[in-house]
Amino acid sequence: MYTVTKSFGLNGLSGFAVEVEADVSGGLPAFSIVGLPDSAVRESADRVRAAIRNLGFKFPDRRITVNLAPADVRKTGPVYDLPLLLALLTASGQLEEIPSDAAFLGELALDGTLRPVSGVLPMALAAAESGIRALYVPAENAAEAAEACGDGMTVYPARTAREVVDALRGIAPIAPAAVIPFDPEDAWAQVPDFADVMGQSLARRAMVIAAAGGHNVLLIGAPGTGKSMLAKRLPGILPPLTREEAVETTKIYSIAGQLPQGRGLVSARPFRSPHHSASSAALAGGGAQFRPGECSLANCGVLFLDELPEFSRESLEVLRQPLEDGQITVSRAAGSATYPSRFQLVAAMNPCKCGYYGHPTRQCTCSPSAVRQYRSRVSGPLLDRIDLCVEMDPIAFDELHTAAPSESSAELRKQVLAARAIQAKRYAAPGFEGIHCNAQLTAGQVRRICRMTPAAERLLRASYDALGLSARAHDRILRVARTVADLSGKQLLDEDALLEALQYRAQEKVEV
């Protein structure tokens, strides 16, 4: 007997429909799975056989052929266990025909318990778009799958395959999954507060500008000057995630298997801090099975690279595509996958190998050539993509004990949100599709948006000639100055905005 059960698979960040076709016929007992299955899918034959018997059903000891259509797309993971079990029960006459508008996802334990699987949200979204009315998933995946509810689709969470069978028979209906309320502003309370940071007024100001305009930042300073402390607090002053950003970020974490069980949409902007020993594959993603890397896991959030020169040159070069295009493509012999990687880069480095070059009280043990060699590990093309660079000096005793209290994250966030509101209104006009903040402006858009006072234009001309600026550096300065002006509520860029933008140039601060 022949039967079909519907399921879904993953291709990059998108789900696609899979038909699990099962045919039980006469002949010597055999169990074959075709349709480009990987090893996890092929192993499902043993899991399904044990689960059927342990649930009290009879395994059909006949010739079984299972096809996963479309047969030209590779199928990965244990997500097809549940639909395969149901297809065999139907094909062997132990279960009535399954509705054509129902789909099933889930891994099976040997006793028939359903285990959670990765990538449920993108598969659930694909199910809703393809007209599925009932989606059965493991209970631990119900919260994320429920985010795809709409257009008539209902998500049913189950803990065992027996529950699914009983629901299909009408014996014991399953209660639909509830959608968890999405409140991104609650996430701010989980981020450390800027009020804890004493001193470092220039670096704090740079972080506000970075948050307001979406700019990348490089912090240079000796150990203990607060570089990591500032970076970890940046998500607390960034705007809240929009629902579209939250869905995209949740899809990435779901595919990577890093979404906490029982969790709906990701509500906090990600903060990723990979160790400097991370390989290029760890940053870009990939592997035997396509998985997002750190660049994609930081999507819509912050990627913090501490000890920047200690990363391998190969790893740092990986950053160029996502910084330029906002996405990263991973290619392997089995195919390719593209993941969004629109992160804000915050990098930190010591001024030299020992960390004390230029320190007011500690002696640097590095030779001038060693300092140059250390700093040259950060390539020029990468520096070209960093808008703000700050040198952080050690904090004096008086700053720690007598300085006025620092502004809190809530106060700084008000400034950032006001500047972002100005940008949102500005870039709602035709011709700015896909632009959300100043850092995303193209060269042509910079000339349209960054209009200056006559005095500011004279200052920029003089600086361009005196400093030998490139065209890219010229545009980068204008983008930062535009953000400074937005924070001040000014329409034209004045001398103050340009002077502040000029002091954050990275090239001279890294070169010795």
Functional labels for PLM-detected ranges:
Residues 34, 40-45, 60, 67-77, ...:
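Basic, amphipathic alpha-helical bundle interface domains used for macromolecular binding and assembly
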Residues 111, 305-312, 355:
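Catalytic P-loop NTPase motifs of RecA-like helicase/translocase cores
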Residues 219-260:
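Walker A/P-loop
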Residues 1-218, 222, 228, 331, ...:
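Peripheral, non-AAA+ core regions of ATP-driven protein-machinery
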Residues 300, 306-307, 318:
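Walker B catalytic acidic pair
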Residues 244, 251-283:
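Clamp-loader machinery-focused feature within the broader ASCE/P-loop NTPase space
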Residues 208, 265, 270, 280-303, ...:
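Conserved alpha-helical scaffold flanking the Walker A/P-loop in AAA+ ATPase domains
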